[in-house]
């Protein structure tokens, strides 16, 4: 019996020690450290995306024009001299692919994309590209994620942080 009591006392002792009696301590995070950490992670993601874009351009032998925002474009076939202006309505045929080459959307399945330039209804990179294009141009655009759907994707087929590759033909401008 004595051995049983010692064993029982031993079990209760360790059970008591295993109970958490400490008060929850609040972890204070330095806002500057958090900001620096987020900036570092963002720089890494931007550099990684930039490397992927450069690799894509080199693999496909594209001679692209790069804008200050990160948009890249090449006109594959020159159309008319009629440059697209802000406020005009543009109709275009398109194929939209991921940087890995997977088809996401196309005008064959979705219909032509029609939008007002500068209206904010399409990806900002696509909107920006219109300033460099003419009626009947055929072009390839590389739109980095920050000029496309960014952090959230399109909640359908485009995942977060996706670089988009558009091949477009400007059908009409009004």
Where are these regions (language model features)?
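Short, Lys/Arg-rich N-terminal segment immediately upstream of the first membrane anchor
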Residues: 1-2, 11
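Cross-family detector of peptidyl-prolyl cis-trans isomerase
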Residues: 2-6, 19-174
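Bacterial N-terminal signal peptides
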Residues: 7-16
């Amino acid at each position: 019996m004595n051995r049983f009591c010692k064993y029982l006392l031993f079990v209760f002792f360790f059970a008591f020690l295993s109970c958490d009696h400490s008060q929850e301590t609040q972890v204070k995070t330095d806002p500057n450290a958090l900001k620096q950490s987020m900036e570092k992670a963002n720089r890494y993601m931007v550099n990684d995306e930039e490397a992927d874009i450069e690799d894509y351009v080199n693999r496909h032998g594209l001679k692209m024009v790069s804008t200050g925002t990160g948009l890249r474009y090449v006109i594959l076939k020159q159309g008319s001299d009629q440059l697209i202006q802000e406020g005009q309505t543009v109709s275009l045929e398109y194929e939209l692919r991921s940087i890995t080459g997977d088809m996401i959307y196309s005008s064959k399945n979705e219909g032509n994309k029609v939008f007002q330039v500068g209206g904010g209804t399409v990806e900002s990179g696509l909107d920006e590209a219109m300033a460099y294009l003419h009626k009947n141009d055929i072009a390839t655009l590389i739109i980095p994620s920050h000029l496309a759907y960014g952090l959230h994707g399109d909640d359908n087929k485009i995942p977060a942080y996706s670089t988009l590759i558009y091949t477009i033909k400007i059908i009409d401008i009004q």
